[in-house]
Amino acid sequence: MASGRDERPPWRLGRLLLLMCLLLLGSSARAAHIKKAEATTTTTSAGAEAAEGQFDRYYHEEELESALREAAAAGLPGLARLFSIGRSVEGRPLWVLRLTAGLGSLIPEGDAGPDAAGPDAAGPLLPGRPQVKLVGNMHGDETVSRQVLIYLARELAAGYRRGDPRLVRLLNTTDVYLLPSLNPDGFERAREGDCGFGDGGPSGASGRDNSRGRDLNRSFPDQFSTGEPPALDEVPEVRALIEWIRRNKFVLSGNLHGGSVVASYPFDDSPEHKATGIYSKTSDDEVFKYLAKAYASNHPIMKTGEPHCPGDEDETFKDGITNGAHWYDVEGGMQDYNYVWANCFEITLELSCCKYPPASQLRQEWENNRESLITLIEKVHIGVKGFVKDSITGSGLENATISVAGINHNITTGRFGDFYRLLVPGTYNLTVVLTGYMPLTVTNVVVKEGPATEVDFSLRPTVTSVIPDTTEAVSTASTVAIPNILSGTSSSYQPIQPKDFHHHHFPDMEIFLRRFANEYPNITRLYSLGKSVESRELYVMEISDNPGVHEPGEPEFKYIGNMHGNEVVGRELLLNLIEYLCKNFGTDPEVTDLVHNTRIHLMPSMNPDGYEKSQEGDSISVIGRNNSNNFDLNRNFPDQFVQITDPTQPETIAVMSWMKSYPFVLSANLHGGSLVVNYPFDDDEQGLATYSKSPDDAVFQQIALSYSKENSQMFQGRPCKNMYPNEYFPHGITNGASWYNVPGGMQDWNYLQTNCFEVTIELGCVKYPLEKELPNFWEQNRRSLIQFMKQVHQGVRGFVLDATDGRGILNATISVAEINHPVTTYKTGDYWRLLVPGTYKITASARGYNPVTKNVTVKSEGAIQVNFTLVRSSTDSNNESKKGKGASSSTNDASDPTTKEFETLIKDLSAENGLESLMLRSSSNLALALYRYHSYKDLSEFLRGLVMNYPHITNLTNLGQSTEYRHIWSLEISNKPNVSEPEEPKIRFVAGIHGNAPVGTELLLALAEFLCLNYKKNPAVTQLVDRTRIVIVPSLNPDGRERAQEKDCTSKIGQTNARGKDLDTDFTNNASQPETKAIIENLIQKQDFSLSVALDGGSMLVTYPYDKPVQTVENKETLKHLASLYANNHPSMHMGQPSCPNKSDENIPGGVMRGAEWHSHLGSMKDYSVTYGHCPEITVYTSCCYFPSAARLPSLWADNKRSLLSMLVEVHKGVHGFVKDKTGKPISKAVIVLNEGIKVQTKEGGYFHVLLAPGVHNIIAIADGYQQQHSQVFVHHDAASSVVIVFDTDNRIFGLPRELVVTVSGATMSALILTACIIWCICSIKSNRHKDGFHRLRQHHDEYEDEIRMMSTGSKKSLLSHEFQDETDTEEETLYSSKH
C-alpha cells in the first residue's frame, strides 16, 4: 500500500534506487523466503490451464477491451456483461466486466459500448445477490492489479463453464464487477520495470496520477478533510466511480494497488492527520480486520507479514494486515469514501513490492493472488442478509436503514428491499427504520462462521397500521432520528461551494435550471407553476432523494425569490443554493441528510417580467418592482383585515394554487431593500404600524432567529445605517406590521390559508447589487439558508389513523390547546406542527370520529413523532339502535387475494405520481391514433380494427343514427364485453357533442388504443380493464364533425347537428333530435354508470353540474371533487389560467367551475345524466382552440392522458355495496339515498356503486316490503368503502308495528262485537213484550175510529172514558188507571 497510497518520504528514495539496481542485475535475485514461498505455491490451479500467451505481456489500451471480451467468451452465454462507467481525461473508456449467472434472460444480447455509462448499461440488478467490486490500476504505474483482474475474469468464466462447484456456486449467488483500470491514461505513460518513481521525476510523469496530475486516491470526499477535494472536472475518473457507487448497492470491495504486500483497512486518515502511527478505528473494525485477514492468510507472502520490499526491508505487518492511518495518513482515499458514504466495505490490497514488474513475473503474481481474490469475494456472504418488505403489499422497501446495536454504522436496503450486513460471528440486535413505517427490531440474531444468517423484516406502514392504546390520554412519543439535520456538519469536511456568480436573466436562468435538472436527475425535478403576464415560465426546482413524490412523513419546504422584480439577491441565492445542494449531495453529510429527509422546492423568480425591466445597481427605485400589469404581487393576496380590490394576477394565482397543492410546512419569501427577517402578521385591523401578533408568535420568532443568527451583519440589528440611520431590529428580526403595514402580503396568506409558516427575509440594503458583490451575499447567507431549512424538522409530526382499517385520515385537524391555529393532515394522514420547546395538549379530530387528546413534550432538537388513532364517532356505534336487527356494516373483504391485489393497485395509483409509473411502464406507440384527425369513415374503420385485433376485450355497438344516418358508435372495453357483470363499476367517456371540437374524439380513440395495446402487457392496465366496464362514445354529433374545418379555432361551423340544433340543449324528456334520443334511450337510461366524462373544446377547464341555474347543487362536494381530480392531473389546467385569446384575463380557481357559472343553459347532457341517469358527469374543455392542427394532437394527448387514466382509477372508489335480505337473497331495485339527496338503485344481484368525495356520508336504504335501513360510511381518497346492507322484512302496517296494529284491531273488533251484542239483546227484549203481554189486539178500523173520536170530542173528560192501553204491567200503572 505504500506507494499505492502516497509518495514516500525523501529519505526512502535511496532505497528505491537500490531496487532499480537489483532489477538491472536480474529479477531472479529475490529474498530466500520469497523463493521458498513460490516453490511451495500450487501450480495446478486453473490459471495454468489458460493459454501460455496470456502471461507474456501487459495488455495496453488497444488490447484491454479484446482481453475482457475474450475472458467473457470463456464462460457460458448470459454470464458476462461488458460496459463502461465513463471515460478518463484523455477519453479512454473505464471498462467494467460484470459476471453473474442469469444475465442472458434479463438483458439483450451484446455488450454496452464505451459511452454507455448509464444505469442500464450493466443490465438490471438481481434480487438476492450481493454486489462485489474489485478496482485495479488506480495509480497508473501500479500494474499488477490490472493484469490480475483480467486473469480473474478468465478464471471465473472458464471455471463456471467447466462446472467447478466452487465457482459455479459463487457466480450463482454473487454479482461480481471487475474494473481492471481506473487510470488508463496513467498506465499508458508508465514504463515496464519501473518499481518506484522511474527517473525520479514527478508522479504524473511516472503514470501514477491522471492526465491532469491528480492522484485519484487523494481526490475523494473525506470526512476528516481540511480542504476541498479537487473539482470533479479535474478527476472524471473519480466522478465516474462515485456515480457508479451511487447507482448501486455494493457490499464489498477491494482496491488493488502495488508498492508493498499487505492488506490495509479503514480509516485511511484521522482528524489529526499525523503522518503515521495513529490507529483510526471504524465502528466495524473487527469486520475489516476479518476481511483483510481473509485475503492475507491466503497469500503466500502477505500472510508472513514481512514483505521485505527493497528500501523497506524492516517493515512488518502483523498477520499481513494494517490499519491505513496507522501505516501512514492518506486524505481523500477511496476506501474511506466507500465506507462513509455508501453501503460498501472496502479494503486496499498491495499486491507486490514492485509497482510495474516485468511481464515475466505476471504468472507468479497471479498464482500468489488467485486464492485470496476468490476468498475475498466469497466473504460477501458473511454476517446477516435478508429482505425488508411492506407487510401489506409484500413489496421490497428500498433505502430502509439497517442499524446494529452497538455499532455506529448503518447500511440501507437495495432496490428490492434486500440487504447484506457484514458482521463477524457474535449475537446482535438489528433494527430497521424507514420513513412512513413502524420501526422493527429483531434481537439475539446469532451470526456464525460461514454463510450469512437470514433475517427478513416485514414493516407495517404507519398509514395503514392500527396503533394500539387509542384511548390513552398521554402519548408515548418518540423522537425521530434525523442524523445531522439539526446539528451542523458532524465532521470537518468542507462542502463544495458554488462558482456560478453572475446575474441570470431569464434565458440564462432557464439554461441553468435545465442543466442541473439534467446533470442530477436522481435528486431534482424542474417544473413550472404557470406563466407570467408576458408568458415566462414560473419555474420551481424540486430537490429530494425521491423527486416528484411526497413521501409520507417527510415535510415539504419552499423558498420563493424575486417577488419584486428589482429585488434580485434572493433569485441569485436560490440558484446558488441549487448548485450547492446538488454538488454536495452524497458527499457532504449535512446536505445529504437534509435532502434525504426533506422535500425542497426552490422558486428563484416569482416575477420574471419585472426582473427584465430592472437595472443593475438599483438601490431604492421601484423600476421593475411590480409585474407587467403594474401590480405589486406582495399586495395582491387575499387579506384578513382589508378587502383587496386589485385583480388577482396570474403570478399570484399560480402561486396560490401551488401552495394549496403541496403540504408545505415552512417557507421564506426572499426580498431586498433592508437586512432583517420579518414575520406575521404583516398588517392589522386598524391599518397602523403596530405589533400584530399571530397565535404562533413564539414559533415565528424562533424560526426567524434561526436565520438571522447565522448572518452576523443581520443579527446586529442595524442594517442600513446610511439609508435608514434610525432603523433598529433587535437580533435582526421584527414583526411585519410593527415595521410597516402591508395588506395583501403573501406570508400572512400562507399562515391563514394553508398549513405553512412563512417569513419574509430582506437580504440586503441594495436591491440590485453589482455582479461582483454576489459572492459576498452567498457567503453571508449560505449558513442561514441551510439552518432555516432545518427548522422544518422542529415541533411535532406524525399520522392520524382510522382505528377501523389503519388508513391515514385526510384533512383531520391537529389543534394545540391555547394556540388558535389548527393544521390539517395530508392525503396519507401525515401532519407537521411547528412548535417551540415545551409541553402541550394536542388534539386530533376529524369529521365522523371521536377526538383524541395527548400531552406532548417538545424538545429543542428533533421532531417528536406522535401518532393518533381515531375511533369512528358514536353515531356509527349507535347505528344498531337506529337500524334494528338488519344493520348495515362497512366491510373490507380481503379474503380474495386478487381483490386485495387490486385494492393495493388502486391505492398505489392514487398515490402521488402513481399514475406516472403506470404511464412509464406502458407502450407509447400511439402514432396510428394521433398523426391525423379521423373523418367519420376513418373513425368507423379504426373502431372496427380495434375489435378485430382485440375481440376478447372489445365490443362495438350502434347506439342509433344521426340526422344524416351516420352511426353513433359505442365501444365497450372490458375482459367480458358481452357478459353482464353488475358488480363491476361502469364508466363512460363521450366526446363530439359539438362537431367543431373534435379533439375529444381523437383523445378517446387514443385512450381506446392505449388500453388495448397495453392489455396483458402492463399489469396495471390489465387489472383496470379486467375490473371495469369502459364505454367509449367518440362522436355524438358525426354530422357536425363532417362539416367542421381543421385549424379553425373559433368557427362555430359544425357545432350543431344537421338540423342546426345544439345537442347540448336538447337533453330533456321531450328530446327532439335523433342523436339525443339515441344517447338518452340507449346509453343514459339503459345502462347503470358510476361516472361519465364528456370532452369538449373552446377553453381549458372542467365544469360540473348543473349547467342550468339552480339555487343549490345536490352532492356538490362530490361533483367538484371529480372535476378537481381531472384538473389536478392535467399539467396546466389546475392553474386556472386558460389564457385563451378571446379571454386572456380569465381566472378559473383550480381550473374547475360549476357549469352554470361558466356558461348557463338548459337541456345539457350532464344535467340529464345526473338527474335522470343518476350518474355524475363532468365536462372537460381540452383546448382553447376548437379545431387545432393535427400536429398538436400528441401534446394534447400527453396533457390529458394522466387525467383520463385518473378517472379509470377514481371509478373504483366511493362506496360499493351489496343489498340482501336476512336469508341472503339479493334485493334489486332497492333505493340507496346518500346524504338525503343522491339516489341510486341496486342492480341485478343487489349491487350498487356510487362515487362520493372523501369523508363521512349518511346512507338510507329503502326497499318495498322491508324495513328502512340507516348507516354511515367513511370514504377514503384512495380506496372504495364496501358496504353490505341486510334488510329485515317490513312487519309494519300503516307505518305502525304489526303487534300494535293487531292489538288495536283486535280490541276494536271486540268492542264492535260487544256493541252489536248489546243492541241485539235490547231488540230481543222488546220483541218478547209483544209475545207475553195481555191486551186487546186492535184492528185497523178501530184505530181509525179512535182517532176520529179523539179529534171530535169537546170535553177532556171524554178522553178518560177510554182506557189507555200500555204494554207494561206494573202495579203502579194499574192503580193509576183504576183511579180514573
UniProtKB/Swiss-Prot annotation:
Keyword Nucleus among record annotations: no
Side of membrane Cytoplasmic, spans: 1321-1380
Membrane topology: Single-pass type I membrane protein
Residue numbers of Phosphothreonine PTMs: 1368, 1370
Domain Peptidase M14, chain residue ranges per copy: 57-380, 502-792, 932-1211
PTM sites of type Phosphoserine: 270, 1358, 1361
UniProt cross-references to SMART domains, sorted A to Z: Zn_pept (SM00631)
Subcellular localization: Cell membrane
Region of interest (Disordered), residue spans: 190-232, 874-899, 1359-1380
SUPFAM superfamilies: Carboxypeptidase regulatory domain-like (SSF49464), Zn-dependent exopeptidases (SSF53187)
Residues annotated as binding Zn(2+) 1: 139, 142, 257
Lipid-binding residues (covalent, S-palmitoyl cysteine): 1317, 1321, 1323
Catalysed reactions, semicolon-separated: Releases C-terminal Arg and Lys from polypeptides
Glycosylation sites: 172, 217, 399, 410, 429, 522, 626, 811, 855, 867, 879, 955, 978, 1070, 1142
UniProt name for this protein: Carboxypeptidase D
Annotated organism of origin: Homo sapiens
